[in-house]
Amino acid sequence: MNRRKIIAVLAITAGAALLATTATALSRGDDPAPAASGAAVVRSDVQRTISAAQDRLKRVPGDAATWAQLGSAYVEQARITGDPTYYAKAQGALDTSLQHKPESNGPAHLGLGALANARHDFAAARDQAELARDALPDTAEVYGVLADALTQLGEADEARAAVQRMLDLEPGVPAFTRAAYDFEQRGDVDAARQALTRALDASPSPADSLFCRYHLGELAFDNGDLDEAAAQYEQGLQIDPLDPALLQGRAKIAAARGDLADALTIYADLVTRVPSPQYLHENAVLLGVAGRTEDAARQFDLLAQQERLLAAAGSTDELATSIVAADRGDPTTALAAAEREWNRRQHPLVADALAWALHLAGRDAEAIGHADRAAATGWRNATFAFHRGMILRALGRTAEAADALGSALKTNPHFSPVDAPAARSALDGLR
């Protein structure tokens, strides 16, 4: 289960920090929210921010700053609820802010940048973040939105500079988590772990602690340490037993340890409460592994419905489309989507998806260049290594194929409930 959406999740931290500032400005008279559940605190904070902004705009309808705050809150609400209709509300509020203050409106451009990242329009996100930076050159959140966009566009050096600026301005959870992702993409797992640990130590709220525990668990899982991954997920679940991301981690551990029934029970609850494309996809794959093909097909149908809703709300995720199509045995759709995404951005995840789609289409001579490009950063990514190994095997480069497949299984023997067994079988055939 490739952690392909981590940067979208990382964007949450900058949004949460901005919303915390917003909530303080708008709701000074409110009682503090209870700290019993990290997710509940975030939901409560965002809803209070929205309500306070709406109340103020009834009194002062021309307040550009409050329109920007409302728009940013709607972006966060879309993430929390999984309801993409909030994107249009966010767009409207942020555009209204710019109508009232068209020049030097840093908060509106910052919100539009976060919105564009959420919609996977990373070029627009970069442009909006740069406008926000012009108005707010010493605001850390600006560099978080900019770093996310640059990372996804494949502009690694520029993204690293933005993260460093963020660290210089405000060395807290949003900066440390982005630094961790940068280290991970370069293959420095120890540095990534240290950065996430610093983020955890700096966490000012239960929600931030949950976030850090989840990503420490993901880092451990992606590098084959199931015990450490499970420990991180479970420590987070002690804070909030219903946190969806941490429950997804628990489900992955169960599947990796061979307890498909437990994993599917967890996913059944997850997709009912949070029917995100990621969870629907992962559930469908596991259902297929369990032999429940009709149930898997229904999950894929629900996934297609969710993707149509996202597209209607202005969100385009051709990378996810390609990955899902490949998993469903549709190389034509997988390749078309991967090519469209590659034309938009040259990120290693997109290079890998394009390589795999080309392989499935029987075009291995073209595929290997993209697989090599995905591997060139040094990222210890078992999926990258597996795809590259299978392409090399198809090209008859057996020694290199065996090395790549062995690397995939050494990095994470449980990287996929489908592809890890396929890697073992292919490797056995090469020996």
Q: Over which residues does each language-model region extend?
A:
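N-terminal leader/linker segments that initiate helical-solenoid repeat arrays
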Residues: N2-E103, P107, D127, P413-H414, ...
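TPR-repeat structural position
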Residues: V46, I80, Y87, F122, ...
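TPR alpha-solenoid repeat register
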Residues: T66, P107-A108, V142, A175-F176, ...
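Canonical tetratricopeptide repeat
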Residues: Q69, L110-G111, V145, R178-A179, ...
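Residue-level recognition of tetratricopeptide repeat
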Residues: S72, R79, A114, D148, ...
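Structural motif corresponding to the intra-repeat A-B loop/turn of tetratricopeptide repeats
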Residues: Q77, T81-P84, R119, L153, ...
